[in-house]
Amino acid sequence: MVRWKKPKRFLCRKTQDYERIDDIENNDEDSDDDVILEINHDGEHEDNYRNPMIRMAYIPIVIIAVIYSSFIFFFALFIEASAHTNSKCSEAHEKEKMSSGLLTPPMKHILEDRTKYKNEIKLLKTFNVHLTYSTWINSILEILALIYSFLLLLVDRQYLYPLSQVILYLFTRINFVYTDIYGRFFSPSDVVGAITTEVIYDLIRWQSESKLFKVFPFTPCPLPLLLFPIFLSILQVFANQKHTHVYETVLLIFFRIMTRFAGRRPFILSYQVLRSGIASFQSATSHDIAKTLNKVTHCCLNVFASSAFFVLLMVLVDKQGLDKTPKCLAALYAFAMWMQLATVRYRHFIPLILTVVIELVITGLVSYQTGEFIFSHTAEVKDYVFTVMFTIIAVFRFVFIIILFKVLIYKNPPHSLTTTVLLKPTNIPVTFSSIKAPQELDPTNPYYPQTVYNSNQSKNNLLPLTRD
């Protein structure tokens, strides 16, 4: 029987969690045992040094090393090498546990079960159609209201209502481009406010003694001309309410269906960790949670490095920056970056505590020296720019320290009943007391309901059996 030789590309083909590895030197052996499955750790056991995001954090470190001192970069490399060695040791330890039967490989959802959310997906398609219709309705209502206002301006009599209508529509449009959550439509309160303002203008017009309108000659707007824009505004209120309701329902269904968080942006994930911790990732698998938290830690590290580099750049750009900051600022930021790197690599609280101490020292020294400089000189507006920017960056860094702390809480959960490994019971039971065991005890039954198992003091604590 002729067997075709497998190409090298097939032998080293890589799938999602497993990699086919074949001994190329033994291609001539006709055996299926040559192809093995080797686990590529990901998520919690991910080798973070391979992640391209981590390389961005070294750019400020290299620049600071070139400007100030080269030992900064070498110490960072030392942390990387030690973390890599520690990762290899933990990987070997887990393989040893797995070979002994004490650890099983984690399960992962490779394909999403679309049949589970069949009704939700159908409902989402329906809601998308409703959102499209409500978008067109809101747009048509806005265009009609504006066209009506400009048509009234073309009449010989310049009414106060059309002019105020145009001004209010333009003002609310500019305002809601920047302030509205959806950025597309008016809210009901603004429409009602616009109507109220227009009615007040018309009511003020009937007071001929008003000093405010003596300078501006105008004629009152007839009531029939006011009915159509009020009717449009009421329709717009209902259309906007319908659109908002459908939009919020779509968001709820979308967050219910979505179980993968790895594709989100790091800053959005960091905000979710800061706001609700790991509770926002309850619908995801443990594999996706681990990948998400790794992305958050990388984002924190990049923020720390880039913010430190930005502060040092402000010191160099400012002519009096060296007088406002201590001379050891670069060394302190370098030491803080080492501790942050060690926190992400070792996933331990001690480097994070040292990071907080260093940040407090930096903030205190810069605040003291900047205040001393401002009080000793004639302060101008530009002298406060560095202080304001440094305060904003310091608060920003402390926020990401809190995010990193929440990630470490999940990475290193406290010892509890759910995280404690219970050993197998022995064949020798130990009772609490004979009162709680009124029935006859059977010492040969290891699963007696009123027994606990202790292999160390089993013989000493065994109660004697008495028979009537």
Swiss-Prot record:
Taxonomic source organism: Caenorhabditis elegans
Q: Tell me which GO cellular component terms the UniProt record holds.
A: membrane
Disulfide bond sites: none
How does this protein lie in the membrane?
Answer: Multi-pass membrane protein
- Stated name of the protein: Uncharacterized protein T28D9.4
Q: Which domain of life is it from?
A: Eukaryota
Q: What is its main location?
A: membrane
Localization annotation: Membrane
Bilayer-crossing regions: 59-79, 135-155, 215-235, 297-317, 348-368, 385-405
Keywords in alphabetical order, please. Membrane, Transmembrane, Transmembrane helix
